[in-house]
Amino acid sequence: NGPSNRAGNGVSTPSPAKKGGTPAKGPASSQPIDKAYTDSIIKNTTDKMFLTDIVDHLPASDKVPTPEKVLGYPIGTPNKLTYTKDQYRYYRELEKTTPRVKTFVAPEKSEGGKEQMLIVVSDEANLAKLARYKEITSKLGDPRTINDELAKQLIAEGKAVYWASGSIHSPETGSPEMLMEMAYRLAVEDSPLIQAIRKNVIVMITPTLEVDGRDTMVDLYNYRKANEGKRVPGLIYWGKYVAHDNNRDSMSMALALTRNQMSTFLEYHPTVLHDLHESVPFLYTSTGTGPYNAWLDPIVVNEWQELAYHEI
């Protein structure tokens, strides 16, 4: 993660493709790959155990641009971090070139006056019915308004909604980079696995929650590169008013990023919200240690544990 190279997200199965060098095609697919980008993945991944046949290559497209085509470098290139404006430029290019990607702007700008974007990726049919799927999750989110029979009908009709949010903590720099590549893969890959995800899941991406802090961290990193041996200016805050405690704001709702996150949650009622952080371990899945809010259904708490076990 971060500016130095690609690192794992808990994937521990070595890819068979590494034995023969760069794979010619993606897994279980006749789809060609982008060889130069794939070579960058292999070169800049810190350990082969982080590579699987899902991520050891990048599928090629003659219509949809890779991150490299827009940014000028593959994701994970050493010494590169991407400003939010360039992240957004890439997602808007995806939206222009594929009907599987839609972009939205959050209601409020940050305290620093910056946009916060939301990206939605799924197949064309799902995106055409996005309003209906939001209606379904809204009804399922309030069981007081429906009975068991209607709930079963809505579940059968609806789609799972998975929301990945990146970099609420600005020094944790990897997720805004990775999410651009993930969006491309979900939009372009034609393997059975990715086709099944597009068909059955609506994927939401908030590339960067703390947009002000992200750009500040990129500034500091670039300063360090340009001024070797000099101390980086010390910061009280990453954002305009807050640092690490920005994800403790759900009660006071003092920050635009928190209000945007809440309004998006209430609009989509996602099945899963996956808030991406970074830590010393290669994989750390937090389900909370309790005591849990007594108003939360114990089934929901148990589902957190199930998700954690599945991820690990």
Question: Whereabouts are the PLM-identified features?
Answer:
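Surface-exposed loop and adjacent secondary-structure segments within mature catalytic domains
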Residues: 108-159, 173-182, 195-255, 260-264, ...
